[in-house]
Amino acid sequence: MVPGAAGWCCLVLWLPACVAAHGFRIHDYLYFQVLSPGDIRYIFTATPAKDFGGIFHTRYEQIHLVPAEPPEACGELSNGFFIQDQIALVERGGCSFLSKTRVVQEHGGRAVIISDNAVDNDSFYVEMIQDSTQRTADIPALFLLGRDGYMIRRSLEQHGLPWAIISIPVNVTSIPTFELLQPPWTFW
């Protein structure tokens, strides 16, 4: 009986390591916190692209989240200079998720957060997949609920700011539940 228990224990310890090593994702979430402007100082939930893009190898304590111009980021960006070495906030639509990610990567962005173009979407995450071309992208690509993207952009417009300051990724398991600052319009 003891060898059987040890075998099950090894399987339980081995399986998560195998899944992580092969990149299988089941309900994978990544969190980031807006530090400024203060009226949206919340922890937001995003989902990584399913089969393209990179991963975060480092935690950015303070990095700019720059809304792309034009918002759909399907071609040349008029504010591409500000996206270099920062993270771009892009809207869904007009071209594939991979195309948007490549545009941001070509402008030197460290990652892209693509928000749904349905601003009333406060609960449905879209699975971002490759567009069947042979192209690739190396930077992380995340999907954000439309309501969250809208609220971030609206706050920046109200304050006349060109970008938000965020911390990404955030380990929410180390934050006590009562300290998690969640957007009041989003269900967790």
From Swiss-Prot:
Its main location: secreted. N-glycosylated; required for efficient secretion. Highly expressed in skeletal muscle, heart and liver. Expressed at intermediate level in kidney. The keyword Cell cycle does not apply. The keyword Transport does not apply. Coiled coil: none annotated. GO terms for cellular component: extracellular region. InterPro entries: PA_dom_sf (IPR046450), PA_domain (IPR003137), PRADC1-like_PA (IPR037323). It holds the Pfam family PA. Residues 1-21 form the signal peptide. It comes from the Eukaryota. PANTHER family: PROTEASE-ASSOCIATED DOMAIN-CONTAINING PROTEIN, PROTEASE-ASSOCIATED DOMAIN-CONTAINING PROTEIN 1. Plays a role in the modulation of physical activity and adiposity. This is Protease-associated domain-containing protein 1. It comes from Homo sapiens (Human). The gene is PRADC1.
